[in-house]
From Swiss-Prot:
This is Mesenteric estrogen-dependent adipogenesis protein. It comes from Homo sapiens (Human). Keywords: Cytoplasm. Highly expressed in the visceral fat depot. It is found in: Cytoplasm. Involved in processes that promote adipocyte differentiation, lipid accumulation, and glucose uptake in mature adipocytes. The gene is MEDAG. Disulfide bonds: none annotated. InterPro entries: MEDAG/TEX26 (IPR043460). GO terms for biological process: positive regulation of fat cell differentiation. GO terms for cellular component: cytoplasm. The keyword Cytoplasm applies.
């Protein structure tokens, strides 16, 4: 029994994608996914482009963004094949919110599209061999969406009227995915956080760091790496389905992985929050808080 416990865990296989991971033309059963960034750029040229020293992400209002896309989280820089690129448009991994409108817009935005994070992985035998991966979080999948929504709801319920900080972390899921001998060198990139600063006279718990919470999001990680042309086409279709804008349909089976919120935010704040009519609206451009940075606002250092 001890020997069985020591056996390495098998990595997810692409065979599951071709045999049923794409449930229908409108829904996909994918929680988390990993693929080389270079492969993502080739499969999604409308959403990402390398231009000089910039990694250009489709902005709200552009034709490519109207067809879907991803919410890219980062600190302004990404390292690909040993070269640093500046992100043209992204959501900061840490933001400060000061009122309910900021909170509502932030919540709607991060759940409106799949999340995308950049990580670098090295082999312990040869640290010079580094590969950049794109980590995808399917916010339309009910299991993933539930963890994020419940995390936000629970912290609000426990600190009503007080300031707090909430972080979502995917490091454990990703590190368990890679086999022994591989190391994620910038694991902190696999998290994002927001800090809600309330106008409270005595905010003792916040002052002493007692209102900081961390939600470790878990889920099945799909391996979307492939050199097969046939499977690359399948992966391309898979990514397009995952990131397509929400369209309401008459069939319940087509709506079961809907991105529309079930109203938990209403229960917490007791106010009317209606879902947006379409995810083609420029969500990021409407944000009143400084969460979206342009490429000129590059931080001074990169981890």
């Amino acid at each position: 029994m001890a020997g069985a416990a020591c056996e390495p865990v098998a990595r997810p296989s692409l065979t599951s994608i071709s045999s049923g991971e794409l449930r229908s033309l409108w829904t996909c059963d994918c929680e988390l996914a990993l693929l080389p960034l270079a492969q993502l750029l080739r499969l999604q040229p409308g959403a990402f482009q390398l231009s000089g020293d910039q990694l250009v992400v489709a902005r709200p209002g552009e034709p490519a963004a109207a067809r879907g896309g991803f919410n890219v989280f980062g600190d302004g820089l990404v390292r690909l094949d040993g070269q640093l690129y500046r992100l043209s448009s992204y959501i900061k991994r840490y933001v400060e919110l000061t009122n309910y409108c900021d909170y509502k817009d932030y919540r709607e935005t991060i759940l409106s599209k799949p999340m995308l994070f950049f990580i670098n992985v090295q082999t312990k035998k040869d640290t010079s061999k580094e590969r950049t991966y794109a980590f995808l979080v399917n916010t339309r999948h009910p299991k993933i969406r539930r963890q994020i929504e419940q995390g936000m709801d629970m912290v609000i319920s426990s600190v009503i009227g007080e300031s707090y900080r909430l972080q979502f972390d995917f490091q454990e899921a990703v590190k368990n995915f890679f086999p022994p001998g591989n190391e994620v060198v910038n694991g902190e990139n696999l998290s994002f956080a927001y800090e809600f600063k309330a106008d409270a006279l005595f905010d003792f718990f916040y002052w002493f760091g007692l209102s900081n919470s961390v939600v470790k999001v878990n889920g099945k990680v799909l391996n979307l790496s492939s050199t097969s042309p046939e499977k690359k086409e399948t992966i391309k279709l898979f990514l397009e389905k995952m990131s397509e804008p929400l369209i309401r349909r008459s069939s319940f089976s087509d709506r079961k992985f809907s991105v529309t919120s079930r109203g938990s935010i209403d229960d917490v704040f007791n106010c009317n929050l209606s879902p947006r009519s379409s995810l083609t609206e420029p969500l990021l451009a409407e944000l009143p808080f400084p969460s979206v940075l342009e490429s000129e606002e590059t931080p001074n250092q990169f981890i």
